[in-house]
Amino acid sequence: MALTTPKPGTRPTTDRTKEAIFSLLDSWGVLDDARVLDLFAGTGALGVEALSRGARELVAVESAAPAAALIAKTLTALKHNRSWEPGMSARVVKARAEKYAAAASAVAPFDVIFIDPPYAFETEACNQLLADLAGRESGELTGEGTVIVLERSTRSDEPTAPEGWDITDRRDYGETAVYY
């Protein structure tokens, strides 16, 4: 299914980067029946790809109304596709990712969290978002086995893992650095 990109300001993950991310996630076996949170969802491509590879639930968080509307349209089309299985769910939350990470609650932790902010998103803000995800107590969005996939510009300062978390890998794909 081809995804549409809202005009200005949305930088979709390149096919090469997306394939590399999902190849690694597949090798770790974390996508089967996964609950996926896609922060700064943009086109929704990462979340939709996760669903196509076995995830059962997607929450896509996007603050830009045109982008959120396009994701909703894509998810509606996907739900009418024969590949959609009973038990799968997907929804869009129109909110700022930072506010969602700091305040939202979940019935169970997410297995995979994609964080793909604009390249101009400051490293301090990125570190705060990670700290907010790590510091939650009730309605936690993360659990012990949660895999975080963070995309940044290779020119950005490296993010700092919150206490108790580790950045275990960094892979560069052109202008994009992906942290796990």
Question: Which residues fall in each region the model found?
Answer:
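Class I S-adenosyl-L-methionine-dependent methyltransferase catalytic core
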Residues: 1-180
